[in-house]
């Protein structure tokens, strides 16, 4: 059995590899070559265990991602099994893996939904996950400028310095959230329970990756974003109905029907066209799929 540590994953996995793997995962889902089960939660006192599983026939593997949140700390592991024999092939420490595949999912959505000419980014959030979100978007579009909003000015400045150096792109911290919305591509990667992005701020042609919330209690954008969007997509409709706070809230208010929400796999595989004009506003709601972990 192979055991990979966080350091191993950091040294071995590149963003181009993560992007290729996640695109492969979405294509496999589209043609029935892969299955991916939604996240499940088990609670004990103040701790929680989350599990999600997936299989891919052509790779001959299935896998399980399990992670705990206890005593203020999260721990992630992915187990890979031989689908023919059931043998445990690998156990992988998966915090970095999860960060990379989450960023890559937004990168693939951007590749297929953002305007080809998109060159500016606005990002809300400056934490661990924000790094790979921006790296992935910069890998699929030629980005010239990034505006960054965070509720912490110190974190915002630190993020701008770090990422401008690693990506060789100009990053500009902004004090007001509306200022970050003046961009071709928007990324929300926060844990906010109240919207940080308003639909009134969106300009025609914007693509939004909303990747911060996988809890029904979280809402990164308001109802007006959904009203203005021409095309809504998610990594999983079933998972969205359990975890996408923005969608669930809008459905409960009668502002959204689930039929409007399409799965990204159909766009990636060419069965569905997402963007139909340069003025369309497109949205990808990312919740995270086990198949992304298994294939990556």
Give the predicted meaning of each segment.
Residues 130-131:
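N-terminal Rossmann-fold NAD(P) dinucleotide-binding loop
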Residues 139-166:
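NAD(P)-binding Rossmann-fold cofactor-contacting core
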Residues 269-296:
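Glycine-rich phosphate/adenylate-binding loop
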Residues 1-99, 107, 117, 291:
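N-terminal ligand-binding/catalytic initiation module
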Residues 126-127:
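Glycine-rich Rossmann-fold phosphate-binding loop(s) that bind the pyrophosphate
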Residues 202-204, 211-273:
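Rossmann-fold NAD(P)-binding glycine/threonine-rich loop
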Residues 113-120, 142, 203-204:
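Short helix-loop-beta connector
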Residues 167-183, 197-200:
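Short acidic low-complexity segments
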């Amino acid at each position: 059995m192979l055991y990979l540590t966080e350091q191993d994953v950091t040294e071995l996995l590149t963003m181009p590899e993560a992007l290729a793997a996640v695109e492969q995962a979405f294509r496999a889902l589209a043609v029935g070559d892969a299955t991916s089960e939604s996240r499940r939660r088990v609670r004990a006192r103040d701790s929680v265990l989350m599990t999600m599983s997936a299989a891919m026939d052509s790779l001959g593997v299935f896998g399980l991602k399990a992670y705990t949140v206890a005593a203020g700390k999260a721990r992630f592991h992915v187990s890979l099994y031989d689908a023919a024999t059931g043998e445990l092939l690998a156990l992988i420490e998966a915090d970095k893996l999860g960060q990379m595949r989450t960023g890559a999912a937004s990168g693939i959505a951007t590749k297929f939904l953002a305007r080809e000419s998109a060159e500016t980014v606005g990002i809300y959030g400056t934490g661990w996950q924000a790094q790979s979100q921006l790296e992935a978007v910069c890998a699929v579009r030629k980005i010239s400028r990034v505006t960054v909003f965070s509720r912490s000015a110190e974190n915002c400045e630190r993020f701008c310095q770090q990422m401008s150096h690693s990506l060789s792109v100009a990053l500009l911290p902004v004090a007001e959230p509306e200022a970050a919305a003046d961009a071709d591509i928007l990324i929300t990667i926060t844990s906010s329970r109240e919207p940080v992005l308003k639909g009134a701020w969106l300009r025609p042609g914007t693509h939004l990756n909303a990747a911060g919330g996988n809890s029904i209690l979280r809402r990164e954008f308001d109802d007006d974003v959904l009203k203005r969007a021409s095309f809504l997509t998610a990594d999983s409709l079933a998972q969205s109905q359990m975890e996408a706070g923005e969608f669930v809230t809008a459905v409960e208010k009668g502002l959204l029907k689930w039929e409007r929400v399409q799965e990204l796999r159909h766009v990636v595989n060419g069965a569905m066209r997402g963007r139909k004009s340069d003025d369309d506003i497109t949205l990808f709601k990312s919740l995270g799929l086990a198949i992304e972990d298994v294939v990556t």
